[in-house]
């Protein structure tokens, strides 16, 4: 386990004395902690201090001086433009400050939210040398018109789960030649109370899926990433399967009949029925063993399986498992055919069916 980034250090640049001197002293104390942790990179976010003075040259001078102190300690300084910064709220201004500071230990930290929430064209990142980008943080968010700080602190989500053009952001980043860490910075009220393992797996999935999308436009991206099939088109729902036992089976049969469904068949050797209304298929599974039996024991009458018609069942499962889904199999009975499947959310199963 490695601490790759120490954050945040707030309200550093643009302060008049004696606050300026105190800011440098604070930085030295943070450097002490970083050296104990074995961390060599600190994130300095653009100042929100009411006493901070504007000016690119003033900020660049502060960072040039800090770069000297950091270099003496074997530390690098990454400057990030907060979307709500007092004077600097745009990565283009942050880059100009870093450029004018002209110090090898001073670089840029890019956060997709801070750029995209202000609707800044991510292609402007392409003009930044990749070796001056020290760290990249990713977050998506739903398109909500609200205060930037509140939006950031409560509504961020995983890349690909919101409305921000995170793929375009990463395409621009990778076009610079950046080869450093890619991290997630997600502030979200639901995540704070969620399962850390589940959230971590979802985060890993989101990064792999995002970088796979980026790789198709930037072929040199991510040599260590798994080779994924392209996303497969879902044509429609093949079936919905319910696990039920005892009187609940009869109740479901009555309900389906009332809704206009008709029993279209029974399994030759299992307590399984197929009900149809046009192209809509519902399966009633009253088996006491296998997945349906386990689902009923855990939750009672429930949807235990969903079948989807897709362009390629094999490609769908291959992509899903590469993104962290767990493949599903169970023993086959006489005359039964294997159908590609994965475990879904909440203990359910998803089967994938194609023309093959």
Task: Please report, for each region that a protein language model flagged, where it lies by residue.
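Structural preference for beta-strand elements that scaffold enzyme active sites
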Residues: 2-7, 40-43, 74-78, 105-109, ...
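Active-site acidic/histidine proton-transfer and metal-coordination neighborhood
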Residues: 5-107, 117, 198, 210-214, ...
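Short, acidic/polar
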Residues: 19-33, 118-127, 166-169, 248, ...
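Histidine-acidic metal/acid-base catalytic patches
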Residues: 38, 90-110, 114-228
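Vicinal oxygen chelate
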Residues: 158, 216-221, 226-230, 235-246, 276-286, 293-356
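N-terminal beta-strand motif that seeds the catalytic metal site of vicinal oxygen chelate
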Residues: 217-248, 303-306, 356
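Core segments of cupin and vicinal oxygen chelate
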Residues: 235, 241-281, 322, 330-334, ...
């Amino acid at each position: 386990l490695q601490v790759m980034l120490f954050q945040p250090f707030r309200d550093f640049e643009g302060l008049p004395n004696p606050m300026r001197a105190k800011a440098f002293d604070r930085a030295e104390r943070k450097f002490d902690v970083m050296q104990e942790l074995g961390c060599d990179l600190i994130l300095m976010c653009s100042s929100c201090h009411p006493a901070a003075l504007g000016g690119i040259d003033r900020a660049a001078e502060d960072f040039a001086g800090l770069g000297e102190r950091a270099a003496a300690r074997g530390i690098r300084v990454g400057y990030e433009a907060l979307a709500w910064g007092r004077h600097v709220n745009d990565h283009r201004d942050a880059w100009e400050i870093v450029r004018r500071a002209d110090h090898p230990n001073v670089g840029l930290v890019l956060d997709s939210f801070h750029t995209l929430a202000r609707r800044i064209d991510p292609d402007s990142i392409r003009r930044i040398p990749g070796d001056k980008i020290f760290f990249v943080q990713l977050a998506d968010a739903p398109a909500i018109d609200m205060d930037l700080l509140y939006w950031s602190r409560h509504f961020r989500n995983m890349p690909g789960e919101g409305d921000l053009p995170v793929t375009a952001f990463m395409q621009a980043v990778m076009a610079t030649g950046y080869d450093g860490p890619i991290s997630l910075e997600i502030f979200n009220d639901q995540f704070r109370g969620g399962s850390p393992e589940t959230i971590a797996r979802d985060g890993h999935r989101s990064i792999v899926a995002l970088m796979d999308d980026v790789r198709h436009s930037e072929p040199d991206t991510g040599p260590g990433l798994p080779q994924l099939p392209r996303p497969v088109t879902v044509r429609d729902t093949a079936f919905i399967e319910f696990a039920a036992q005892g009187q609940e089976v009869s109740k479901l049969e009555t309900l389906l009949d009332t809704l206009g469904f008709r029993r279209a068949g029974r399994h030759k050797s299992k307590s399984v029925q197929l009900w149809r209304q046009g192209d809509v298929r519902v399966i009633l599974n009253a088996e006491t063993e296998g997945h349906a039996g386990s689902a009923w024991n855990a939750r009672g009458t429930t949807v235990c399986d969903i079948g989807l018609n897709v362009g390629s069942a094999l490609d769908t499962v291959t992509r899903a498992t590469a993104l962290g889904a767990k493949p599903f199999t169970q023993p086959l009975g006489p005359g039964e055919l294997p159908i590609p499947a994965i475990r879904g959310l909440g203990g359910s199963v998803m089967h994938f069916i194609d023309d093959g």
